[in-house]
């Protein structure tokens, strides 16, 4: 007999669900743990259709995993959020969140209420962020461009392009500085999305290059067109310039065969008139996302205009933004009249088709509204080029964040070790139950230097103990304050001054990863009940016929 409330599913409550959630989070963290740090290893992921991805990027690994457990999904989304918000630190944010959960579960087993733990974690996170901002940040104005290059090198050190760190770091910094513009509030902005990254497999990765201007992976639509135009006026069209045909279903009854020729002529004339309206404004470069008819190409060749077809929508948007053009999906106004004005054109100093590496590319140089830059990556194969692109994206985001926040923190586990010592001392000053949670938060942060050392095949216990001793000395003894920059040297297996060595990370990466990891851990920690509904069975009659409903007594006849 069913109770007054029957749930069509499984219900898991209390300690059991909390343990399940912690195990799910720990298993996700274990997948990405070995890819952390400059000597982290790569993962090979093969999807259901056999596509192979080789990567070291935490967000990419977790995006490609098909995770079923709801708590594990929270961590996968967490890595994605960190990637979108900051661009780097995706692996460490997942590892910290899982460790916070694991330690919280231990406290719950000791009969500490989850609410007390949540309060302690929130307090510890707030205190940690305050400590970073007051004691650990280094102003980039003191260090200049070298600081940006070092931050980019630190980001790349764990990636495939880390071997040529100096070469790529300079390229990344130059690319980000090239797209700088000032917004309406007078603040400098660095839109990383406007840097076009093209991949061409072949040659070595050292033969990658930075181009000042927007590189378009297309060629001119006809051989008769000019390959170079100075003082370009660019029209960006989101429709095809092909002979207009009547829509399907339109029937025209013709009594005179000559009328058929007139209809065909009119179809051709509609497109011809559109082209004439565009060319009349002085446009000499036409970019369209659709196709261009051979008949239409003739008009462009005659007027010595460059026309490019099948341009990607993404590229068209970026070019329009850089050149000041307006993207048009139709020439018709609300009244139905077709027109094209000169104000809709974008401007650039030069548009030229060049052979770069082994491919023909169209370069749009010195655009009027904003500057643009393109990076062409070379690599042994497609897997390598894809991973280089992901590594480059992380480095570009890091440089952008350093320029915007104007501050960096030392890398190599220095921040986590300093926070661990500080929060342990802070916990002892608390007279409430939150003391235990803050102490566990401090212990959880040590997972980062620990994992870095393990991945580098070093003695993690010994290294982390030495690191903590240095940071304790820095906080206790004001005369030895400079020891707070001490982090790990993973190649030689000893602590070193990471400020002098130039191992830097953007402050935002550390602050955001702490905040995101704490919030994710709290979200999962608050769960004490899981109700998983059964999928509706096929022989379920609830969606049956009228006769079935009458027969079951659900409705009266």
UniProtKB/Swiss-Prot annotation:
PROSITE patterns: TCP1_1, TCP1_2, TCP1_3
Its job: Component of the chaperonin-containing T-complex (TRiC), a molecular chaperone complex that assists the folding of actin, tubulin and other proteins upon ATP hydrolysis. The TRiC complex mediates the folding of WRAP53/TCAB1, thereby regulating telomere maintenance. As part of the TRiC complex may play a role in the assembly of BBSome, a complex involved in ciliogenesis regulating transports vesicles to the cilia.
Gene: TCP1
Disordered: region residues: 538-557
EC category name: hydrolase
UniProt protein name: T-complex protein 1 subunit alpha
Assembly notes: Component of the chaperonin-containing T-complex (TRiC), a hexadecamer composed of two identical back-to-back stacked rings enclosing a protein folding chamber. Each ring is made up of eight different subunits: TCP1/CCT1, CCT2, CCT3, CCT4, CCT5, CCT6A/CCT6, CCT7, CCT8. Interacts with PACRG. Interacts with GBA1. Interacts with DLEC1.
Catalytic activity annotation: ATP + H2O = ADP + phosphate + H(+)
Residues carrying N-acetylmethionine: 1
Compositionally biased intervals (Basic and acidic residues): 538-550
Organism expressing this protein natively: Monodelphis domestica (Gray short-tailed opossum)
PANTHER family: CHAPERONIN
Main location: cytoplasm
GO biological process: protein folding
